[in-house]
């Protein structure tokens, strides 16, 4: 008789939690909430202390401080009690300064340490001290993971310790922490760490770092800009060229890391799609550090020369919209996220958002008589919404050497599969019984399969006939759906192409690829285009999804309710039959079978240009899927991060002048880094045969390595190569 299964020791853990309390083991499964997750991390750190010979129970450790930071905004009672317990311990217990070893991963990492300042700093400090200057204190920087938990998109966790005294050169106000001039405040890390857990789970920590360049805005004003290209849409047949809209252009810039290429290199993605079966999006955090602010002046000599000087008093404005009060503007749909190459400086995109503008455009074709109805309405006063960051979001001022951390945001999203389905409706359920089987190698059963079609048993929904065939037998549901494609609907703000979920169809013709809804991406040198290619024409690719949605437009037909065999031309509608008096238009262009019986997978991750997460609509009836991103945040999504150079004014500033204010030309370079955590399930093999995996041929290999002048590109990679059955 097998021994009884060994149960994990639960200890003194209150109901509703798995790790918040003493005396339990570390194999309790997934934490129940952010406070429980913080407790699990705290317990793992304590275990590391004990393995290294230190007793964390008698001292206040960095792990205790990390737990305090992560639970300071806790809304559950257990998190609040734990938070105040360790605050009390902090007040009475001696400090344990040494940090525990990090848990091992497939790529070992070292704890983040402050780099030592250069020797001339100490020489300067000694001179200033001798002259009577105050003693400069060095602030102790915690690693980025010490930021506050942000389960509801709360306020950013910024380090407010600032160095004081004249030796640092960056004293004064500001919302971020300060490392001081000449002292590094962070690390450059673009490693992807794979931590293999129990029961086939893998924790994937994607680290990303970029040098970000930011120029001062052209204007300090918000502008309402209306785009009007009625000259093009006034021509018959040009409805799809309509670009009329209104937008608010702001002086702010958006730091957007919401694209797969920001986080994973091609080798990482190959490993993930070849070995994992599904992805869970766990948490996200980001930080700005090592801020550099410089002014530009131009000499009066001929030819003029530019002089660049560090400005220790200029400010970088940083705002985190943690409560999602501003319009959500993911930049991946415009290919304007942070760049995909870690060693190349990148720029944040100018932030703008849509403003309401009514528009009427009546469809026409080249043979239409008369001028198209092409009305340029304007903004409805009832729908005016003008947002400003300055009075909606806390703004932090950073100077040279300062830093800013957002804290950790925990996602609430459904998982994303990394497998595709091959089954359509014709491959669901039990196949028909065969009376005879082939007797020779390679032989095929031709003709009748053993039982006359009108004598078979089973279930159909066909009236007026007793025939049961593979075409007429009733299946449990509809795999995929027929969607209108090349279909434009009219809204009060103009026509728009209706989105459809991507899926592989039948024959690979241009017509059918469009019908399958496969997205087509256009991008520049920051996002995968060959870096040495000249010209402004973007590079493009069409992502053909592996999953099968059951669409095959050129083979669809509709049969009359009075089912007749054979059918005549008056009781069947074929793809070649005219619709509305026009020929060559499939009924699939206008027919939608998406309904309560439809079975459909989520959209695939599109590496590297695809969007990762999206915001849930604030509507009562919500879409079940979004076509831009596989992860849809159920409650809140990470706050958008905005940056802007504060106005660096001259003595000629006149508040009554109508022209742009007089400013010193200023720009900033700062380092951005982030951490995006996933959990993935290892893919188990259930078939005898091996399967196709992500690989490359000899010619494609050289896309991923630099040429003799440094040219390289990123080729898109499939994400759902492994097949699976869905029924």
Curated annotation (Swiss-Prot):
- The segment annotated Phospholipase A2-like runs over 19-64
Q: What is its main location?
A: virion
Q: Where in the cell is it found?
A: Virion; Host nucleus
Q: Where is the composition biased (Basic residues)?
A: 1-10
> What residues bind Mg(2+), as annotated?
323
Q: Of which family is this protein a member?
A: Belongs to the parvoviridae capsid protein family.
One cellular component term (GO) for this entry is: T=1 icosahedral viral capsid
**Highest rank taxon of the organism:** Viruses
* Cystine pairs: 633-637
Keyword DNA-binding tagged? no
Q: Which Pfam families match?
A: Parvo_coat, Phospholip_A2_4
Task: Pinpoint motif Nuclear localization signal by residue range.
Answer: 4-13
One GO BP annotation here? Answer: clathrin-dependent endocytosis of virus by host cell
Q: Which UniProt keywords apply?
A: Capsid protein, Clathrin-mediated endocytosis of virus by host, Cytoplasmic inwards viral transport, Disulfide bond, Host nucleus, Host-virus interaction, Magnesium, Metal-binding, Microtubular inwards viral transport, T=1 icosahedral capsid protein, Viral attachment to host cell, Viral penetration into host cytoplasm, Viral penetration into host nucleus, Viral penetration via permeabilization of host membrane, Virion, Virus endocytosis by host, Virus entry into host cell
Which residue ranges does the record annotate as region Disordered? 1-40, 95-120, 141-184, 503-535
Extra remark beyond the main annotation: The capsids of autonomous parvoviruses expose a proportion of VP2 N-terminus and part of that sequence can be cleaved of to form VP3.
Q: What is known of its domains?
A: The N-terminus of VP1 is sequestered within the mature capsid. It contains a phospholipase A2-like region and nuclear localization signals that might be exposed by capsid modifications during virus entry.
Its protein name is: Capsid protein VP1
Q: What does this protein do?
A: Capsid protein self-assembles to form an icosahedral capsid with a T=1 symmetry, about 22 nm in diameter, and consisting of 60 copies of two size variants of the capsid proteins, VP1 and VP2, which differ by the presence of an N-terminal extension in the minor protein VP1. The capsid encapsulates the genomic ssDNA. Capsid proteins are responsible for the attachment to host cell receptor TFRC. This attachment induces virion internalization predominantly through clathrin-endocytosis.
Write out the biased-composition intervals (Gly residues): 166-183
Q: How does it assemble?
A: Interacts with host TFRC.
Q: Which GO terms describe its molecular function?
A: metal ion binding; structural molecule activity
């Amino acid at each position: 008789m097998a021994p009884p299964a060994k149960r994990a020791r639960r200890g003194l853990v209150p109901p509703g939690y798995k790790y918040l309390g003493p005396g339990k083991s570390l194999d309790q499964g997934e934490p129940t909430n952010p406070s429980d997750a913080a407790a699990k991390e705290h317990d793992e750190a304590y275990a590391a202390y004990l393995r290294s010979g230190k007793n964390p129970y008698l001292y206040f450790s960095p792990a205790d401080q990390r737990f305090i930071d992560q639970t300071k905004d806790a809304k559950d009672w257990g998190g609040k009690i734990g938070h105040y317990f360790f605050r009390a311990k902090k007040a009475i217990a001696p400090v344990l300064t040494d940090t525990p070893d990090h848990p091992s991963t497939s790529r070992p990492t070292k704890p983040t340490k402050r780099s030592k300042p250069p020797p001339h700093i100490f020489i300067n400090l000694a001179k200033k001290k001798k002259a009577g200057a105050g003693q400069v204190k060095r602030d102790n920087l915690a690693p980025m993971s010490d930021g506050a938990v942000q389960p509801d998109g709360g306020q950013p966790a910024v380090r407010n310790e600032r160095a004081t005294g004249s030796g640092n050169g960056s004293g004064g106000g500001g919302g971020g922490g300060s490392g001081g001039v000449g002292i590094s405040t962070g690390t450059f890390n673009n490693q992807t760490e794979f931590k293999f857990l129990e029961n086939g789970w893998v924790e994937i920590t994607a680290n990303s770092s970029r040098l970000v360049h930011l120029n001062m805005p052209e204007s300090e004003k918000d502008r309402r800009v209306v785009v009007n290209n009625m000259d093009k849409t006034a021509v018959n047949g040009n409805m799809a060229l309509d670009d009329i809209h209104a937008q608010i252009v702001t002086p702010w810039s958006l730091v957007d890391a919401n694209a797969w290429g920001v986080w994973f290199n091609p080798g990482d993605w190959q490993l993930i799609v070849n070995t994992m079966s599904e992805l869970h999006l766990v948490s996200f955090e980001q930080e700005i550090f090592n801020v550099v602010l410089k002014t530009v002046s131009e000499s009066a000599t001929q030819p003029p020369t530019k002089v660049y000087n560090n400005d220790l008093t200029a400010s970088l404005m940083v705002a985190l919209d943690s409560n999602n009060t501003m319009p959500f503007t993911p930049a991946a749909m415009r290919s304007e996220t942070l760049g995909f190459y870690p060693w190349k400086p990148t720029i944040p995109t100018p932030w703008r958002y849509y403003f309401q503008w009514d528009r009427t455009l009546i469809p026409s074709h080249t043979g239409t008589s008369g001028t198209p109805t092409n009305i340029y309405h304007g903004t409805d006063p009832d729908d005016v919404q003008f947002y400003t960051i300055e009075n909606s979001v806390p703004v932090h001022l950073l100077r040279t050497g300062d830093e800013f951390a957002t804290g950790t945001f925990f996602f609430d999203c459904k998982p994303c599969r990394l497998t595709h389905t091959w089954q359509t409706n014709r491959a669901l359920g039990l196949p028909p019984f065969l009376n005879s089987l082939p007797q020779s190698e390679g032989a095929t059963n031709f003709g009748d399969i053993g039982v006359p079609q009108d004598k078979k048993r089973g279930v159909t929904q066909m009236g007026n006939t007793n025939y049961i065939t593979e075409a007429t037998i009733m299946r449990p549901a509809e795999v995929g759906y027929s969607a209108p494609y090349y279909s434009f609907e009219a809204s009060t703000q103009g026509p728009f192409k209706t989105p459809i979920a991507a899926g592989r169809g039948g024959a690979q013709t241009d017509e059918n690829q469009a019908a399958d809804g496969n997205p087509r991406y256009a991008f520049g040198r920051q996002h995968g285009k060959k870096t040495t290619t000249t010209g402004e024409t973007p590079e493009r690719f069409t992502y053909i999804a592996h999953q099968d949605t059951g669409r095959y437009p050129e083979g669809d037909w509709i049969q009359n309710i009075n089912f007749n065999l054979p059918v005549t031309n008056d009781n069947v509608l074929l793809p070649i039959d005219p619709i509305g008096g026009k020929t060559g238009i499939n009924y699939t262009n206008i027919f939608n079978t998406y309904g309560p019986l439809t079975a459909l997978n989520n959209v695939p991750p599109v590496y590297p240009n695809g969007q990762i997460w999206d915001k849930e609509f604030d509507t009562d009836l919500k879409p079940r899927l979004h076509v831009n991103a596989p992860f849809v945040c159920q409650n809140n999504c990470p706050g958008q991060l905005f940056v802007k150079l504060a106005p660096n004014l001259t003595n000629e500033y006149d508040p009554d002048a109508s022209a742009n204010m007089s400013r010193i030309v200023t720009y900033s370079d700062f380092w951005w880094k982030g951490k995006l955590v996933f959990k993935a399930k290892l893919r188990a093999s259930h078939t005898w045969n091996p399967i196709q995996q992500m690989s490359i041929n000899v010619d494609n290999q050289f896309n991923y390595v630099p040429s003799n002048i440094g040219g390289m590109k990123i080729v898109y990679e499939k994400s759902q190569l492994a097949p699976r059955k869905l029924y």
